[in-house]
Amino acid sequence: MAREKFERNKPHVNIGTIGHVDHGKTTLTAAITNVLAKKGQAEKQDYADIDGAPEERERGITINTAHVEYETDTRHYAHVDCPGHADYVKNMITGAAQMDGAILVCAATDGPMAQTKEHILLAKQVGVPALVVALNKCDMVDDEEIIELVEMEVRELLDSYDFPGDDIPVVQVSGLKALEGEAEWEAKIEELMAAVDEAIPEPEREVDKPFLMAVEDVFSITGRGTVATGRIERGKVKVGEEIEIVGIKDARKTTVTGVEMFRKLLEEGMAGDNCGLLLRGIQKEDIERGMVLVKPGSITPHTKFEGEVYVLKKEEGGRHTPFFAGYRPQFYIRTTDVTGQITAFTADDGSAVEMVMPGDRIKMTGELICPVAMENGMRFAIREGGRTIGAGVVSKIIE
């Protein structure tokens, strides 16, 4: 049977459900697909379909994630839901599931709990731009005042992590009752999705961002010059444009004199393309793997940064023993390993710790031996002798 063509007539947005264990994230996800399926905008999925998500590997880390897709009247959504708390931490830090926004699920019966806080903090640190709150299990709370108190508590919590607590929509839902087909609760799911359509901004497309390509390989072509190959991460580049080479050595500018893909010459390369760029006046030894080609001035090289890191457990192929401040691993950034040092660290909530155990999540300060093009939200892996022992995301650039 011929595959259906993916219709790109609606803007695409990536979202996910986050929140404390057993507050009903997966049930709510199932309810969304069931309610939208009645309008022909989704395929119905039940709790078991979503809960039995297969394992995936991202940067050498095993993560369980369920992916569902659905549409509203105005948008196409890809929605991720994770069964376990550890899966969320790994997912958000590795960027396996980049979220343009998230539905924070909080049970009205419990109010905000430990992981509610942790997921809000994680969302802030890894740069999830917008949230919508689903107060779930509202069918189980008879007293409207209790629901209002929980709502106030959630809003204050969001404020304390620098989300606009007063402005974020909070919708009272019951995932279970909506799944069971009760009309008033189905209407609440529609209200929730209308809030998501409204409050989660449409992401800027990769192709509209400033050009960036990480260099994977370099060739010199006799009589023509030097070609750098790689995958264009974002933006686009045209023949004749000036670009900058950033990282490892001093930054320098050059002009793109050719764009080549599958041995064909192109006028321009775009985000997602694997291509070669012919660079004017550049020698093969001027450029190496680990550098990036960028729109001039759009990104700068740095050596010192703070990051959020998940350290792999022994069972995940990580270290068997703890490490201490002063530990010197390799940081795998885009296409290359750069040696660096973890000069300091704390537990993820900022409390002091003496050492880092496999399976921990930490905030760390790192210092690289040579500058690398870096920006907030950039992902990296921490490696030791070629095997991944941790995954991280840059939360703040120091110098």
Curated annotation (Swiss-Prot):
Enzyme's top EC category: hydrolase
CDD domains from the UniProt entry: EF_Tu, EFTU_II, EFTU_III
Keywords annotated in UniProt: Cytoplasm, Elongation factor, GTP-binding, Hydrolase, Magnesium, Metal-binding, Nucleotide-binding, Protein biosynthesis
Region (G2): 60-64
Cross-referenced PROSITE patterns: G_TR_1, G_TR_2
Region listing for G3, in residue ranges: 81-84
Enzyme Commission no: 3.6.5.3
Binding positions (Mg(2+)): T26
Region listing for G5, in residue ranges: 174-176
Region entry G1, spans: 19-26
tr-type G domain ranges (all copies): 10-204
GTP-binding in keyword set: yes
Reactions listed under catalytic activity: GTP + H2O = GDP + phosphate + H(+)
Subcellular location: Cytoplasm
Segments traversing the membrane: none
Annotated Gene Ontology cellular component terms: cytosol
PANTHER family (alphabetical): ELONGATION FACTOR TU, MITOCHONDRIAL, ELONGATION FACTOR TU-RELATED
Family of the protein in this entry: Belongs to the TRAFAC class translation factor GTPase superfamily. Classic translation factor GTPase family. EF-Tu/EF-1A subfamily.
Protein purpose: GTP hydrolase that promotes the GTP-dependent binding of aminoacyl-tRNA to the A-site of ribosomes during protein biosynthesis.
UniProt subunit comment: Monomer.
HAMAP family: EF_Tu_B
Name of protein: Elongation factor Tu
Species for this entry: Parasynechococcus marenigrum (strain WH8102)
Upper lineage: Bacteria, Bacillati, Cyanobacteriota, Cyanophyceae, Synechococcales
